[in-house]
Regions:
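Face-selective signature of the C-terminal outer-membrane beta-barrel domain
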Residues: 236-252, 277-279, 285-449, 460, ...
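Gram-negative outer-membrane beta-barrel transporters
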Residues: 373, 377, 428-434, 531-534, ...
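Short acidic/polar hinge/loop motifs at secondary-structure boundaries
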Residues: 85, 115-145
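Periplasmic-side early beta-strands and strand-to-turn transitions of outer-membrane beta-barrels
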Residues: 149, 162, 170-174, 178, ...
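N-terminal Sec signal peptide and the immediately downstream disordered periplasmic leader
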Residues: 1-68, 75, 80, 192, ...
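N-terminal periplasmic accessory domains that precede
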Residues: 73-76, 95-97, 109-111, 126-131, ...
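Extracytoplasmic beta-strand/coil segments of soluble accessory domains associated
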Residues: 74, 78-114
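Outer-membrane beta-barrel signature, preferentially recognizing the C-terminal barrel domain
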Residues: 272, 281-295, 299-303, 356, ...
Length: 696
C-alpha cells in the first residue's frame, strides 16, 4: 500500500513538473502552438472564448461524443470530463460529483433551462435526469466547475452542466441503431433547415432495456421501455431576432422482479423481539416504475451590435409512480410452531405504492449590454413557481386526501412554493486582465432571502499562458421533499423507511475559491488548479427511532459541515493532426468535519488517461483508448462500519468508429474490458455497445 501511495504521488508530481517545464521549453524553442479555441455561454451567460473565462470550464463537443461512441450523456461525461460518477443505490441513476461536491449540489440544465425531476431530497433527480436526455439531440455539453449561484441561484454550489441541443442548420435526415449489453435503441433526427422565416428540428428515440440481475442481488435491475420526442421551431422575425418554441416528451415504463420463486430459509421475529422462528418460505416479489416528463417553452431572442437579449417562459412537468408487491407462495414452518410461524409469515404479504408529480413554471429575462469593446454588463431576473404533489408529502402538505390501491391506503397532499431573483454581472477587459464580478439576490417563499456574490479574474500573461482565480458563495435551497416529506415506503424487500421533512431547514451554504494556471506549449497544453470549498448547513436525514408502524423513522436536519479541497490537472499532447494523448487528474481531500470522517463515494485520486486517434477522413477511422484509475475510493461502508473503507481499481476502455463514407458510420465500444466487479465500488462488470448511423 505504501508503494502504491508513493507511486501515485510520483505520478502526480511528474505531471505537474512536465506541465511547468513544458511551458518553459515551449517558449525557448518557439514551437508552433495548436489552437484550442471554443466559444462557451454557460460560465458568464454570454459568448466568450473558453480560455478567456475565469471559471474552470470544459466543453464536450459533438465530435467528442461520436468519436467516443457515447450512448448517453452520462456515458459522454465519464469519458471526457473530470467528473466522478457512481451508481445510486436506489432506482438507478448515477452520482455526479464535481470537485467532490455531491449530486444535489450540481445544477443540470438543458439549453440554459432547469428541468423538473423527482424533487428528491438526496439528488436522485439529478442522478436520473442525465439518462433521460436524448444524446442524439446534443450539440455540446458545457461543464462549469465551482460555485455558480451568482448567476444561476440554488443547486449550483458545485457547478453547472448545461446540455445544449442541436440547432437547425441545414436540411438533414439522420437515423441510427444502437445495441448494448444493457439495451437496444433506435433514433431519428430531422432538420428542415431554414425555409423562408422558419426552421425546425425533430428528434425521436426508442429504447428497450434488458432484464438483468446480479448474482448477489435479491431483485433484478429495472427493465422495460422508454421513448423520447423533441421538437424545436424557430420563426425569424428579422436578421436580428427570432422566436423559438419547443416541446420535449419522455416516457419510461419499467419492471423489477425477484426471479423464479424458490423455497429459501427465513427467520421471523415477533414485534416484541422476544421470539425468533426459523423455517423456509417461498416468496415472489414484483415492482414497477413509471416516469413521464413534459417540457414546453417559448423564447424571444435578439442580438444587435450593443445588445444580446432573451425573454422566455417555460413549463416542465414530471410524474413518477412506483409499486412494490411481495407475495407468500408457500412455507415449511418449524415443527410445533406452525401457527405462529405462518401468522408472522403472512406479514410478508405487502403492497406499497407511491404516485407523485413535480411541476415547474418559470419566466426569465436577461440582457447583455456592450458598453464598449472592453466592457459588457449582463443583468436579468426570473420568477419560478413549483408544485409538488403526491403520496411523498403524505399529510404534510395542503389538500390532504386518501388514495387506496390494492388494499393499501395512503395519504396524499400538495405544496406550492415560489421564488424570484435578480442578478447583475460586469465583464471588464483592462490590458491583460479580464475581471468578472457578479451578484445575485434570491427570495424564496419558504426560507426567505439569500445573496450570492462572486468574482473571477483571468490574467493573460502571454497569448499561451494564463492565470485564473475565482471566489464565490454558493447555496442549495432545501427541496420541497426535505421541507415537507411524509414518505413511508419499502426501500428494498421488507425494509420500511419513514422519511419526514422539516419546514425549519436553512439553505446549505458554501464559500469557495480556486487558483489555477493554463497554458499551450508547442503541441501540448495543460492546466493546474487548486480548489477549496467550505460547506455549512449540510442537510441530512437523522434516525429518530421507530414510527407507530414499527418503521425506521428519519427526519431532515441541518447538522453537517464539510471541507472539500484538492488539485485538478490536465495535461495533453498532440503528436500530429490525428493522434493526441491526454490525462486528467483530481487529487481530493473531502471531509465531513462535523463527524471527522471521509465523505463517501469519492476517490482520493481519480485519473483518466486517453489516447485519441482521428484521421478526419470521410472514409476513415477514429478510436479512443482510455483508462480510469480511482485510488482510495471511499465506499458506502465507511459510515456503516464507523471507519473509512477504501478500495483502489483501474478500468480499461476502448471505442472504435469506422466512417464508411461521408454519410454512414459504424461504431462500437467496450468499457471495463477486464470485467471487474465490486458491489462496494458499484462496478457491475463489462459494458459493450455497437451502433450504426446514416445520413440520407
Amino acid at each position: 500500500m505504501n508503494n502504491t501511495k508513493t507511486a501515485q504521488r510520483k505520478a502526480l508530481l511528474a505531471a505537474i513538473t512536465v506541465f511547468v517545464m513544458g511551458g518553459v521549453t515551449a517558449q525557448a524553442e518557439e514551437l508552433p502552438v495548436y489552437s484550442f479555441d471554443e466559444v462557451v455561454v454557460t460560465a458568464t451567460r454570454t459568448e466568450n472564448d473558453v480560455k478567456k473565462v475565469p471559471a474552470s470550464t470544459q466543453v464536450i463537443t459533438q465530435e467528442d461524443i461520436k468519436r467516443g461512441g457515447a450512448t448517453s450523456v452520462r456515458n459522454a461525461l465519464s469519458m471526457y470530463a473530470n467528473i466522478f460518477q457512481k451508481s445510486k443505490v436506489r432506482g438507478g441513476g448515477h452520482d455526479i460529483i464535481i470537485r467532490g461536491m455531491e449530486t444535489k449540489h450540481s445544477l443540470v440544465m438543458v439549453n440554459g433551462r432547469r428541468i423538473s425531476n423527482e424533487a428528491d431530497a438526496n439528488g436522485l433527480g439529478n442522478a436520473m435526469s442525465l439518462d433521460r436526455i436524448n444524446i442524439n439531440d446534443v450539440e455540446k455539453i458545457e461543464i462549469v466547475r465551482g460555485p455558480s449561484s451568482a448567476l444561476y441561484g440554488s443547486e449550483a454550489m458545485g457547478g453547472v452542466l448545461n446540455i445544449i441541443t442541436k440547432p437547425s442548420k441545414e436540411q438533414t435526415l439522420l437515423t441510427g441503431l444502437e445495441h448494448t449489453s444493457e439495451d437496444t435503441s433506435h433514433w431519428w433526427h430531422a432538420d428542415t433547415g431554414r425555409i423562408g422565416n422558419f426552421s425546425m428540428t425533430l428528434d425521436a428515440r426508442f429504447n428497450k432495456i434488458n432484464r438483468s440481475m446480479l448474482e448477489t442481488a435479491t431483485e433484478s435491475d429495472p427493465y422495460g421501455t422508454a421513448q423520447t420526442y423533441n421538437a424545436s421551431l424557430n420563426y425569424y422575425v428579422n436578421d436580428h431576432s427570432y422566436v423559438n418554441a419547443y416541446m420535449d416528451y419522455y416516457s419510461q415504463h419499467l419492471k423489477t422482479d425477484t426471479g423464479t420463486p424458490t423455497m429459501k430459509p427465513i427467520t421471523l421475529t415477533t414485534s416484541s423481539g422476544k421470539m425468533s422462528l426459523s423455517g423456509q418460505a417461498m416468496l415472489e416479489g414484483t415492482g414497477s416504475k413509471a416516469y413521464k416528463q413534459k417540457n414546453y417553452g417559448i423564447s424571444w431572442n435578439g442580438k444587435t451590435d450593443k445588445n444580446d437579449w432573451q425573454i422566455q417562459a417555460y413549463m416542465s412537468k414530471f410524474n413518477w409512480s412506483t409499486t412494490s408487491n411481495t407475495k407468500v407462495l408457500g412455507s415449511i414452518p418449524p415443527a410445533g410452531m406452525e401457527g405462529m410461524f405462518n401468522y408472522l409469515l403472512q406479514k410478508k404479504n405487502t403492497y406499497d405504492f407511491n404516485h407523485d408529480e413535480h411541476n415547474m413554471w418559470a419566466i426569465e429575462g436577461r440582457d447583455s449590454l456592450r458598453v464598449n469593446d472592453h466592457h459588457r454588463v449582463t443583468f436579468g431576473a426570473e420568477y419560478v413557481k413549483e408544485k409538488v404533489a403526491g403520496t411523498g408529502l403524505g399529510k404534510n402538505g395542503d389538500g390532504v386526501h386518501s388514495i387506496t390501491e390494492n388494499g393499501t391506503t395512503k395519504s396524499s397532499s400538495e405544496k406550492t412554493l415560489s421564488s424570484y431573483a435578480a442578478y447583475l454581472q460586469d465583464e471588464i477587459e483592462y490590458g491583460k486582465w479580464f475581471i468578472v464580478p457578479a451578484i445575485r439576490y434570491d427570495h424564496h417563499s419558504a426560507y426567505g432571502s439569500h445573496t450570492s456574490p462572486k468574482i473571477g479574474v483571468t490574467y493573460n500573461a502571454t497569448d499561451h499562458f494564463r492565470i485564473k482565480a475565482n471566489y464565490g458563495d454558493g447555496f442549495k435551497a432545501p427541496s420541497v421533499s426535505q421541507l415537507y416529506y411524509d414518505l413511508d415506503m419499502e426501500m428494498g424487500r421488507g425494509n420500511w423507511v419513514h422519511l419526514t421533512g422539516n419546514p425549519n431547514l436553512k439553505p446549505e451554504k458554501s464559500k469557495s475559491w480556486d487558483l489555477g494556471v493554463e497554458a499551450e506549449f508547442g503541441k501540448g497544453y495543460g492546466s493546474l488548479t487548486y480548489f477549496d470549498n467550505d460547506v455549512d448547513n449540510l442537510i441530512t436525514s437523522i434516525p429518530k427511532g421507530k414510527d407507530s408502524n414499527g418503521h425506521n423513522l428519519h427526519r431532515y436536519e441541518n447538522v453537517n459541515k464539510a471541507r472539500i479541497k484538492g488539485l485538478e490537472n490536465t495535461l495533453g499532447y498532440r503528436f500530429n493532426d490525428t493522434l493526441e494523448f491526454k490525462v486528467t487528474s483530481t487529487l481530493l481531500d473531502a471531509k465531513d468535519t462535523s463527524a471527522g470522517k471521509d465523505l463517501t463515494q469519492r476517490a482520493r485520486l481519480s485519473q483518466i488517461y486517453q489516447l485519441i486517434y482521428d484521421d478526419h477522413k470521410d472514409t476513415g477511422w477514429s478510436a479512443v483508448l482510455w483508462n480510469q484509475l480511482d485510488y482510495k475510493f471511499v465506499t458506502g461502508k465507511a459510515w456503516e462500519s464507523g471507519e473509512s473503507v477504501k478500495k483502489s481499481y483501474s478500468l480499461t476502455n476502448f471505442s472504435l468508429t469506422r466512417k464508411v463514407n461521408k454519410d454512414t458510420r459504424v461504431y462500437g465500444s467496450v468499457q471495463n474490458i477486464f470485467d471487474k466487479k465490486d458491489a462496494d465500488c458499484d462496478l457491475d462488470g463489462r459494458f459493450w455497445s455497437i451502433g450504426w448511423e446514416h445520413k440520407f
